[in-house]
Amino acid sequence: MSGHSKWATTKHKKAVIDAKRGKAFAKLIKNIEVAARTGGGDPAGNPTLYDAIQKAKKTSVPNDNIERARKRGAGEEAGGADWQTIMYEGYGPNGVAVLIECLTDNRNRAAGEVRTAMTRNGGNMADPGSVSYLFTRKGVVTLEKGDQSEDDVLMAVLDAGAEEVTDLGDTFEIVSEPTDLVAVRSALQEAGIDYDSAEADFRASVEVPVDADGARKVFKLVDALEESDDVQNVYTNVDLSDEVLAELDD
């Protein structure tokens, strides 16, 4: 199992806890609003909106909240903000690369909060391009294992452009090119396999191994960044060995 998959496992466990917070709901709602504004308010003709709604439903966001966000984004209802996507780059403890994806209606506030979180938790901001080249944009679909084997999932998505299927313990993760994401998700649906989320993600092409102490410091930094309402996603190139994961679970 590669380092990013272990990181994904840890992030998944954390996401289950985070899903209980209103902050996580707000970020999912924001994704729906932006997707509707960018590609139209009909999920049938807007795959990004469809997937944003699917993820929100799987995370138990109330249907009324989802529908209001869709309407705001589509211009059917007043109150939508002018959200902008901004990427920040930096280095965390142990030289770990950090890519921070913000969705904000106030660039100055977002920049200030990101900088504060970085400097207070052993990180440093970096110039644009100094970290992003270490990451590649990928399509990622996650699903609960259920009754499916890894081979079942692989057979369903192989011809749709899936590059790999990874067993993450309680879930499977399917990675593809971003352009094949809808095809992979559709292949699962045609095979009658339910999925949790389908979205574009950043994956590290070069990873940095850390010990348990280093991992805790990186998690602390990521937590601080994700406390900002403007931060949608935080990506790192940390590599967690099985030994480090076992120590973290103790």
UniProtKB/Swiss-Prot annotation:
One of its GO terms (cellular component) is cytosol. GO terms for molecular function: DNA binding. It comes from the Bacteria. Keywords: Cytoplasm, DNA-binding, Transcription, Transcription regulation. The keyword Transcription regulation applies. Gene3D superfamilies: 1.10.10.200, 3.30.70.980. It is found in: Cytoplasm. GO terms for biological process: regulation of DNA-templated transcription. NCBIfam families: PRK00110.1, PRK12378.1, YebC/PmpR family DNA-binding transcriptional regulator. Belongs to the TACO1 family. This is Probable transcriptional regulatory protein RHA1_ro06891. It comes from Rhodococcus jostii (strain RHA1).
